[in-house]
Amino acid sequence: MQKRDDAFSITINDPDLIDESAIIVMETINDALLLIFKENSIYRLLTADSTDPQKTQPDTGHTYEKIATIGAASPYVARIFLQFKRIIDQVFPEDSIKPKLLEQVWSLNEQLLVCAQFESNIREQLDDVMQKCDTIIEQNKSSRAIPPLAKVKNLESDAKSFLLVGKQFLIDCFKLISLFTDLPLGARDEAHFDKHIKWLQQNRPTLKKLSSALGNDLFWIRRLSECRNAIEHPGPGQSLTIENTKLHPGNKFSLPTWSYDLTNKINVKESSIPIHQELDAYLNNMLYLLEEILLFCISESLPADGMFSIYQHNEADIKPNCPIKYYASLSAKFYSRLKPS
């Protein structure tokens, strides 16, 4: 019988998820967390020692648990943790902010994946709901009474949960910036995003591109944040309502929408916005926001000797099963120093 400390190989056989895609890579975070990235899912490896640290049962086996049904083939995974884990390992020494940085990047990626799952829960029901609504209306259009339309299940829970996790993601993005810049963040003002951007403009002029990018993103950042606040603290000028499928004049129907009035804090008031479209837009914005923060902050933190630079892969070199876009390598300037004179 194989001993628990022997080298071993592992095959993922998850009874709850039929995912025959390949294991793309396994990554560790500070020797405390081992992650298995398949094309379409992510697992956490639980070694025998983590299950039985006192080694009281020598036959204790290794196991694993599912983290996400989104894997390395998704930009939400490849373009965040997998991309920047390689860059961070290459350019940061162990006695730097590296351990904390890796923890924060993975935590943010987990939040992004949670939001992606909430969005997917809604979006993946839409085709079926539309077909059912069309059938109900078609079969009953000659009648004066149309039965209730098909609904998106768990709509309100998933939509509101997206906003709750989404706002925390935004706060944690600025905590990530603080790790690089010492941006002051208090418990009472951690969501004062405009204040944080102003501080960066005044105190970190070398990060001008980051401040500019954050300023351009401020509108949607505050809108998401205030939509979340409208859930927790509703009132005049701070409200959000969610509506599932709805019948309209002429026997037409609409997919789920939400309406919000955020005029108590920002000049935003919208009606009947398709929820799935706005969540998709938020997800993409969140991906690009986090990627930009990491690119700008890491670029500013590269060794002063100019040894490394960050480059972008040619489109043809980006792999569909793990579409990493950026990488770190020796800079052209450093290469020139290596050439014999």
Q: Across the structure, where does each feature detected by a protein language model lie?
A:
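A glycine-rich, hydrophobic loop/mini-helix early in the fold
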Residues: 122-136
